[in-house]
Protein backbone atom coordinates (compact mmCIF):
# COMPACT_ATOMS: atom_id res chain seq x y z
CA UNK A 1 0.00 0.00 0.00
CA UNK A 2 1.06 3.59 -0.61
CA UNK A 3 1.96 5.86 2.30
CA UNK A 4 -1.50 7.49 2.38
CA UNK A 5 -3.20 4.09 2.66
CA UNK A 6 -0.76 3.04 5.38
CA UNK A 7 -1.60 6.11 7.46
CA UNK A 8 -5.34 5.43 7.12
CA UNK A 9 -4.87 1.74 7.99
CA UNK A 10 -2.82 2.66 11.07
CA UNK A 11 -5.60 5.00 12.24
CA UNK A 12 -8.19 2.26 11.79
CA UNK A 13 -5.92 -0.24 13.57
CA UNK A 14 -5.66 2.02 16.62
CA UNK A 15 -9.47 2.13 16.79
CA UNK A 16 -10.15 -1.56 16.15
CA UNK A 17 -7.38 -3.19 18.17
CA UNK A 18 -8.60 -2.33 21.72
CA UNK A 19 -12.14 -3.46 20.85
CA UNK A 20 -11.01 -6.73 19.29
CA UNK A 21 -8.41 -7.46 21.98
CA UNK A 22 -11.15 -7.55 24.60
CA UNK A 23 -12.95 -10.29 22.63
CA UNK A 24 -9.98 -12.41 21.52
CA UNK A 25 -9.31 -15.81 23.08
CA UNK A 26 -6.48 -15.90 25.64
CA UNK A 27 -4.49 -18.69 23.94
CA UNK A 28 -3.94 -16.72 20.73
CA UNK A 29 -0.43 -15.21 20.61
CA UNK A 30 0.26 -13.96 17.08
CA UNK A 31 0.32 -10.25 16.20
CA UNK A 32 -1.06 -9.17 19.58
CA UNK A 33 0.29 -6.63 22.09
CA UNK A 34 2.55 -8.07 24.81
CA UNK A 35 2.40 -11.57 23.29
CA UNK A 36 5.03 -13.45 21.35
CA UNK A 37 6.12 -16.81 19.98
CA UNK A 38 7.84 -17.42 23.32
CA UNK A 39 4.45 -17.34 25.08
CA UNK A 40 2.99 -19.80 22.56
CA UNK A 41 5.87 -22.25 23.07
CA UNK A 42 5.64 -21.88 26.86
CA UNK A 43 1.91 -22.66 26.80
CA UNK A 44 2.52 -25.70 24.56
CA UNK A 45 5.17 -27.00 26.97
CA UNK A 46 2.81 -26.45 29.91
CA UNK A 47 0.06 -28.49 28.26
CA UNK A 48 2.51 -31.28 27.42
CA UNK A 49 4.00 -31.51 30.92
CA UNK A 50 1.26 -30.57 33.37
CA UNK A 51 -1.91 -31.48 31.48
CA UNK A 52 -0.36 -34.64 29.98
CA UNK A 53 -1.38 -33.84 26.41
CA UNK A 54 0.41 -36.58 24.46
CA UNK A 55 -1.14 -36.10 21.00
CA UNK A 56 -1.17 -32.98 18.88
CA UNK A 57 -3.25 -32.21 15.79
CA UNK A 58 -1.49 -30.10 13.17
CA UNK A 59 -3.88 -28.37 10.75
CA UNK A 60 -2.47 -26.49 7.76
CA UNK A 61 -4.79 -23.99 6.04
CA UNK A 62 -4.14 -23.58 2.31
CA UNK A 63 -3.05 -20.01 1.54
CA UNK A 64 -4.90 -18.56 4.51
CA UNK A 65 -4.19 -14.86 3.89
CA UNK A 66 -5.14 -15.24 0.21
CA UNK A 67 -8.42 -17.06 0.85
CA UNK A 68 -10.16 -15.12 3.63
CA UNK A 69 -13.86 -14.75 2.83
CA UNK A 70 -14.68 -11.02 2.76
CA UNK A 71 -18.37 -11.33 3.62
CA UNK A 72 -17.64 -13.62 6.56
CA UNK A 73 -14.89 -11.31 7.83
CA UNK A 74 -17.16 -8.24 7.81
CA UNK A 75 -19.83 -10.19 9.72
CA UNK A 76 -17.26 -11.25 12.30
CA UNK A 77 -16.20 -7.62 12.79
CA UNK A 78 -19.85 -6.71 13.38
CA UNK A 79 -20.20 -9.54 15.91
CA UNK A 80 -17.13 -8.29 17.80
CA UNK A 81 -18.80 -4.92 18.26
CA UNK A 82 -17.57 -2.95 15.22
CA UNK A 83 -21.03 -1.65 14.28
CA UNK A 84 -20.10 1.62 12.56
CA UNK A 85 -21.39 1.07 9.02
CA UNK A 86 -19.13 3.76 7.56
CA UNK A 87 -16.03 2.12 9.05
CA UNK A 88 -17.18 -1.30 7.85
CA UNK A 89 -17.60 0.15 4.36
CA UNK A 90 -14.05 1.61 4.43
CA UNK A 91 -12.62 -1.78 5.45
CA UNK A 92 -14.62 -3.43 2.66
CA UNK A 93 -13.17 -0.99 0.11
CA UNK A 94 -9.65 -1.78 1.38
CA UNK A 95 -10.26 -5.50 0.94
CA UNK A 96 -11.61 -4.94 -2.58
CA UNK A 97 -8.91 -2.45 -3.62
CA UNK A 98 -7.45 -3.31 -7.06
CA UNK A 99 -3.92 -4.74 -7.15
CA UNK A 100 -1.37 -3.87 -9.85
CA UNK A 101 0.53 -7.04 -10.82
CA UNK A 102 4.19 -7.05 -12.04
CA UNK A 103 3.07 -7.75 -15.61
CA UNK A 104 0.99 -4.55 -15.65
CA UNK A 105 -2.44 -6.15 -15.33
CA UNK A 106 -4.90 -5.09 -12.62
CA UNK A 107 -6.55 -7.67 -10.37
CA UNK A 108 -9.73 -7.09 -8.37
CA UNK A 109 -9.56 -9.44 -5.35
CA UNK A 110 -12.72 -11.31 -4.39
CA UNK A 111 -11.15 -12.88 -1.29
CA UNK A 112 -8.05 -12.59 0.88
CA UNK A 113 -6.44 -9.74 2.81
CA UNK A 114 -3.96 -7.21 1.32
CA UNK A 115 -0.36 -8.44 1.27
CA UNK A 116 1.80 -6.28 3.54
CA UNK A 117 -1.23 -4.39 4.84
CA UNK A 118 -1.07 -2.98 8.36
CA UNK A 119 -4.58 -4.27 9.07
CA UNK A 120 -4.01 -7.78 7.69
CA UNK A 121 -2.62 -9.38 10.91
CA UNK A 122 -5.51 -8.04 13.00
CA UNK A 123 -8.08 -9.18 10.42
CA UNK A 124 -6.46 -12.64 10.39
CA UNK A 125 -6.95 -12.88 14.15
CA UNK A 126 -10.57 -11.73 13.76
CA UNK A 127 -11.23 -14.58 11.31
CA UNK A 128 -9.60 -17.33 13.40
CA UNK A 129 -10.86 -16.02 16.75
CA UNK A 130 -14.08 -17.89 16.03
CA UNK A 131 -12.08 -21.11 15.71
CA UNK A 132 -10.38 -20.44 19.06
CA UNK A 133 -13.67 -20.05 20.89
CA UNK A 134 -15.20 -23.06 19.13
CA UNK A 135 -12.36 -25.33 20.29
CA UNK A 136 -12.52 -23.81 23.78
CA UNK A 137 -16.28 -24.46 23.95
CA UNK A 138 -15.69 -28.18 23.43
CA UNK A 139 -13.93 -28.53 26.79
CA UNK A 140 -12.24 -25.52 28.35
CA UNK A 141 -15.45 -23.51 28.87
CA UNK A 142 -17.74 -26.38 29.88
CA UNK A 143 -18.71 -26.31 33.56
CA UNK A 144 -21.61 -27.37 35.76
CA UNK A 145 -22.77 -26.59 39.28
CA UNK A 146 -22.48 -29.67 41.47
CA UNK A 147 -24.61 -30.35 44.52
CA UNK A 148 -21.55 -31.79 46.24
CA UNK A 149 -18.31 -29.84 45.73
CA UNK A 150 -15.29 -31.80 44.52
CA UNK A 151 -13.01 -33.17 47.19
CA UNK A 152 -9.90 -31.10 47.79
CA UNK A 153 -6.71 -32.81 46.61
CA UNK A 154 -3.20 -31.94 47.74
CA UNK A 155 -0.04 -32.75 45.78
CA UNK A 156 3.09 -34.22 47.37
CA UNK A 157 4.65 -30.76 47.30
CA UNK A 158 1.82 -29.49 49.51
CA UNK A 159 0.23 -27.40 46.75
CA UNK A 160 -3.52 -27.69 46.18
CA UNK A 161 -4.18 -29.66 42.96
CA UNK A 162 -6.77 -27.55 41.16
CA UNK A 163 -6.43 -29.55 37.94
CA UNK A 164 -8.15 -32.62 39.42
CA UNK A 165 -10.84 -30.49 41.06
CA UNK A 166 -11.61 -28.72 37.79
CA UNK A 167 -11.77 -32.06 36.02
CA UNK A 168 -14.57 -33.14 38.36
CA UNK A 169 -16.59 -30.07 37.36
CA UNK A 170 -16.74 -30.83 33.65
CA UNK A 171 -20.25 -31.32 32.32
CA UNK A 172 -19.47 -32.11 28.68
CA UNK A 173 -19.28 -35.57 27.12
CA UNK A 174 -16.67 -34.29 24.67
CA UNK A 175 -13.01 -34.99 25.23
CA UNK A 176 -10.30 -32.80 26.68
CA UNK A 177 -8.57 -30.59 24.11
CA UNK A 178 -6.78 -27.24 24.01
CA UNK A 179 -5.71 -24.94 21.19
CA UNK A 180 -2.56 -22.82 21.01
CA UNK A 181 -2.50 -20.46 18.02
CA UNK A 182 0.00 -18.04 16.51
CA UNK A 183 -1.64 -16.29 13.52
CA UNK A 184 -2.67 -19.08 11.08
CA UNK A 185 -0.27 -21.59 12.67
CA UNK A 186 -1.99 -23.55 15.44
CA UNK A 187 -1.92 -26.82 17.33
CA UNK A 188 -4.70 -28.70 19.11
CA UNK A 189 -3.52 -30.81 22.06
CA UNK A 190 -5.36 -34.03 23.04
CA UNK A 191 -4.77 -36.97 25.37
CA UNK A 192 -5.55 -39.93 23.10
CA UNK A 193 -5.27 -40.75 19.40
CA UNK A 194 -9.01 -41.42 19.26
CA UNK A 195 -9.72 -37.88 20.47
CA UNK A 196 -7.15 -36.50 18.05
CA UNK A 197 -8.77 -38.26 15.08
CA UNK A 198 -12.18 -36.88 16.01
CA UNK A 199 -11.01 -33.30 16.46
CA UNK A 200 -8.95 -33.43 13.27
CA UNK A 201 -12.02 -34.42 11.24
CA UNK A 202 -14.30 -31.96 13.06
CA UNK A 203 -11.88 -29.04 12.68
CA UNK A 204 -11.36 -29.71 8.97
CA UNK A 205 -15.12 -29.76 8.38
CA UNK A 206 -15.70 -26.71 10.55
CA UNK A 207 -13.07 -24.62 8.75
CA UNK A 208 -14.50 -25.63 5.39
CA UNK A 209 -18.16 -24.99 6.14
CA UNK A 210 -17.94 -22.15 8.65
CA UNK A 211 -14.98 -20.07 7.44
CA UNK A 212 -14.85 -21.29 3.81
CA UNK A 213 -11.18 -22.28 4.21
CA UNK A 214 -9.52 -25.34 2.71
CA UNK A 215 -7.15 -27.58 4.66
CA UNK A 216 -4.04 -29.11 3.10
CA UNK A 217 -4.39 -32.86 3.64
CA UNK A 218 -0.68 -33.48 3.00
CA UNK A 219 0.41 -31.12 5.78
CA UNK A 220 -2.36 -31.97 8.24
CA UNK A 221 -1.79 -34.84 10.63
CA UNK A 222 -1.56 -36.23 14.15
CA UNK A 223 1.68 -36.62 16.11
CA UNK A 224 2.36 -38.77 19.16
CA UNK A 225 4.70 -36.49 21.10
CA UNK A 226 6.27 -39.43 22.93
CA UNK A 227 7.48 -40.90 19.64
CA UNK A 228 8.01 -38.02 17.23
CA UNK A 229 8.80 -34.34 17.20
CA UNK A 230 6.15 -31.81 16.23
CA UNK A 231 7.28 -28.51 14.69
CA UNK A 232 5.85 -25.20 15.84
CA UNK A 233 7.17 -21.68 15.15
CA UNK A 234 10.66 -22.92 14.30
CA UNK A 235 10.87 -25.26 17.32
CA UNK A 236 10.63 -29.05 17.62
CA UNK A 237 8.52 -30.32 20.54
CA UNK A 238 8.66 -33.80 22.04
CA UNK A 239 7.87 -35.59 25.31
CA UNK A 240 10.38 -37.82 27.08
CA UNK A 241 10.12 -39.75 30.32
CA UNK A 242 12.28 -38.67 33.23
CA UNK A 243 11.84 -39.97 36.79
CA UNK A 244 8.37 -41.34 35.96
CA UNK A 245 7.31 -37.95 34.61
CA UNK A 246 6.79 -36.54 31.14
CA UNK A 247 9.23 -33.73 30.41
CA UNK A 248 9.08 -31.56 27.29
CA UNK A 249 12.14 -31.50 25.06
CA UNK A 250 12.42 -28.54 22.68
CA UNK A 251 14.99 -27.82 19.97
CA UNK A 252 15.41 -25.82 16.77
CA UNK A 253 13.60 -27.46 13.88
CA UNK A 254 15.80 -28.85 11.11
CA UNK A 255 14.76 -26.28 8.50
CA UNK A 256 15.43 -23.36 10.86
CA UNK A 257 18.86 -24.72 11.78
CA UNK A 258 19.76 -25.18 8.12
CA UNK A 259 18.59 -21.63 7.25
CA UNK A 260 20.62 -20.19 10.11
CA UNK A 261 23.71 -22.10 8.96
CA UNK A 262 23.41 -20.91 5.36
CA UNK A 263 22.76 -17.31 6.41
CA UNK A 264 25.80 -17.20 8.69
CA UNK A 265 27.99 -18.87 6.04
CA UNK A 266 27.07 -16.19 3.50
CA UNK A 267 27.86 -13.42 5.99
CA UNK A 268 31.23 -15.00 6.89
CA UNK A 269 32.15 -15.15 3.18
CA UNK A 270 31.21 -11.49 2.83
CA UNK A 271 33.43 -10.60 5.83
CA UNK A 272 36.40 -12.34 4.19
CA UNK A 273 36.20 -10.15 1.08
CA UNK A 274 35.62 -6.53 2.15
CA UNK A 275 36.27 -3.62 -0.19
CA UNK A 276 37.38 -1.32 2.63
CA UNK A 277 37.65 -1.13 6.43
CA UNK A 278 34.25 0.52 6.85
CA UNK A 279 32.53 -2.25 4.91
CA UNK A 280 34.38 -4.85 7.01
CA UNK A 281 33.15 -3.20 10.22
CA UNK A 282 29.55 -3.03 8.92
CA UNK A 283 29.54 -6.69 7.89
CA UNK A 284 30.97 -7.83 11.23
CA UNK A 285 28.27 -5.86 13.06
CA UNK A 286 25.60 -7.44 10.84
CA UNK A 287 26.99 -10.92 11.56
CA UNK A 288 27.00 -10.27 15.31
CA UNK A 289 23.43 -8.97 15.25
CA UNK A 290 22.31 -12.08 13.33
CA UNK A 291 23.94 -14.39 15.90
CA UNK A 292 22.37 -12.44 18.78
CA UNK A 293 18.96 -12.53 17.06
CA UNK A 294 19.09 -16.31 16.65
CA UNK A 295 20.22 -16.71 20.26
CA UNK A 296 17.47 -14.45 21.63
CA UNK A 297 14.69 -16.25 19.71
CA UNK A 298 15.73 -19.85 20.37
CA UNK A 299 17.21 -19.51 23.87
CA UNK A 300 13.95 -20.78 25.44
CA UNK A 301 14.51 -24.24 23.91
CA UNK A 302 15.61 -26.84 26.45
CA UNK A 303 18.30 -28.42 24.21
CA UNK A 304 19.35 -25.38 22.22
CA UNK A 305 23.01 -25.96 23.13
CA UNK A 306 23.04 -28.99 20.80
CA UNK A 307 21.78 -26.92 17.87
CA UNK A 308 24.15 -24.01 18.56
CA UNK A 309 27.08 -26.41 18.77
CA UNK A 310 26.18 -27.85 15.36
CA UNK A 311 25.77 -24.39 13.81
Question: Which residues make up each language-model segment?
Answer:
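Conserved polymerase palm-domain catalytic core
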Residues: 23-27, 32, 39-217, 222-225, ...
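A conserved non-catalytic segment of reverse transcriptases
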Residues: 96, 105, 211-279, 283-285, ...
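Glycine/proline-rich, flexible active-site/cofactor-binding loop segments
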Residues: 1-25
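Short helix-capping/linker segments at secondary-structure and domain boundaries
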Residues: 16-23, 132-133, 299-302
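"…together with the soluble PPM/PP2C metallo-phosphatase catalytic core" -> "…together
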Residues: 5, 89, 93, 241
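Non-catalytic, peripheral interaction segments enriched in hydrophobic/basic residues
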Residues: 283-311
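Duplex nucleic acid-engaging cores and interfaces of nucleic-acid transaction enzymes
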Residues: 3-11, 37, 41, 55
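Structural motif
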Residues: 1-7, 85-86, 114, 118, ...
